[in-house]
Curated annotation (Swiss-Prot):
It comes from Nitratiruptor sp. (strain SB155-2). This is Protein RecA. ATP binds at G65, P66, E67, S68, S69, G70, K71, T72. Can catalyze the hydrolysis of ATP in the presence of single-stranded DNA, the ATP-dependent uptake of single-stranded DNA by duplex DNA, and the ATP-dependent hybridization of homologous single-stranded DNAs. It interacts with LexA causing its activation and leading to its autocatalytic cleavage. InterPro entries: AAA+_ATPase, DNA_recomb/repair_RecA, DNA_recomb/repair_RecA_CS, P-loop_NTPase, RecA-like_C, RecA-like_N, RecA_ATP-bd, RecA_C_sf.
Length: 344
């Protein structure tokens, strides 16, 4: 760059620093590249699929899927993992349907969980913005977008038309939230439902998420959660097999997916994942129907091996550490350059 241009640029930077504060405009080469921190999802496979060991801190995340697919369970597991690391979490219960005992069973510290049950959408999103601006909360979960009903709709008459009100509300809120959560390093997770597009024909999926298109664009990560099988023990249903697909990822390559078990009343089965990934990575030996780790016989059949790991958490932790090392997930901080790898 010639001398005159450099002088003009230096002057412009000084003016910007004076108007907006030092560091408002910097050369990327002068700024230290910081690693992207993450919060574990409670699922080894999903942590791997997300590419950085969990959901990114300081970003907006959307978890969506059909009813009873495990969306809220996954969000509560993320809260539990954040709390285990000493983090503070908030749950905005717009659906007024939080099961406190279930959350406790998943490992959530309910005594220290911040909970709000707002009356309408604007109130919910104002609360989210206020606690995000405090910089004291690590993760905020909103359950769900569909329940963020605008005040005008609640106060209106049944049958009144309120076309596009919720979409406008979400668009306005996300414009304000994106910068705040990044600056304060707070992860905001929106749980969303799916609907069928009216009059959808031809190619492409007939499904869409609620609340307009704003969340699709502002979310750094979008995870599609689907139930793919029912787990049974004899005639009794004991859980669901779930597939989680990362359909958008701005911090790592997208379109990876993971499968894991969600057990009724317990949440994500970490023991099941340890066995699946342990066998896949030759950390656990499978001979016929027997599973063994080093000189330890874990049991005959997958359910017995899971039961052994549940009864012997020190063995489960040792296996998990080996798997995480093999996956390159020793820590929740992964050195991945920030990029815009997927817009949808």
């Amino acid at each position: 760059m010639d001398t005159n241009k450099q002088k003009a640029l230096d002057l412009a930077i000084k003016q910007i620093d004076k108007a907006f504060g030092k560091g408002a405009l910097v050369k990327l080469g002068d700024k230290q590249i910081e690693p992207i921190e993450s919060i574990s999802t409670g699922s080894l496979g999903l942590d791997l699929a997300l590419g950085i060991g969990g959901v990114p801190k300081g970003r907006i995340v959307e978890i969506y899927g059909p009813e009873s697919s495990g969306k809220t369970t996954l969000a509560l597991q993320i809260i539990a993992e954040a709390q285990k690391k000493g983090g503070v979490a908030a749950f905005i219960d717009a659906e007024h349907a939080l099961d406190v005992l279930y959350a406790k069973n998943l490992g959530v510290d309910i005594d220290n969980l911040l909970v709000s049950q707002p009356d309408f959408g604007e109130q919910a999103l104002d609360i989210v913005e206020t606690i995000a601006r405090s910089g004291a909360v690590d993760v905020i979960v909103i359950d769900s977008v569909a329940a963020l009903t605008p005040k005008a709709e609640i106060e209106g008459e049944m049958g009144d038309s309120h076309m596009g009100l919720q979409a406008r509300l979400m668009s306005q809120a996300l414009r304000k939230l994106t910068g705040v959560v990044h600056k304060m390093d707070t992860t905001v997770i929106f749980i969303n439902q799916i609907r069928m597009k009216i009059g959808a024909m031809g190619y492409g999926t007939p499904e869409t998420t609620t609340g307009g298109n704003a969340l699709k664009f502002y979310a750094s990560v979008r995870v599609d959660v689907r139930r793919i099988a029912t787990l049974k023990q004899g005639e009794s249903q004991i859980g669901n097999r779930v597939r989680a697909k990362v359909v958008k990822n701005k911090v790592a390559p997208p379109f990876r997916q993971a499968e894991f078990d969600i057990m009724f009343g317990e949440g994500i089965s970490k023991e099941g994942e340890l066995i699946d990934y342990g066998v896949k990575m030759d950390i656990i030996d499978k001979s016929g129907s027997w599973f063994s780790y080093k000189d330890i016989k874990l049991g005959q059949g997958r359910e017995n091996a899971k039961a052994y790991l549940k009864e012997h958490p020190e063995v489960a932790q040792e296996i998990e550490n080996e798997i995480r090392r093999a996956m390159g997930m020793d820590d929740s901080v992964m050195m991945v350059p920030e990029n815009e790898m997927s817009e949808e």
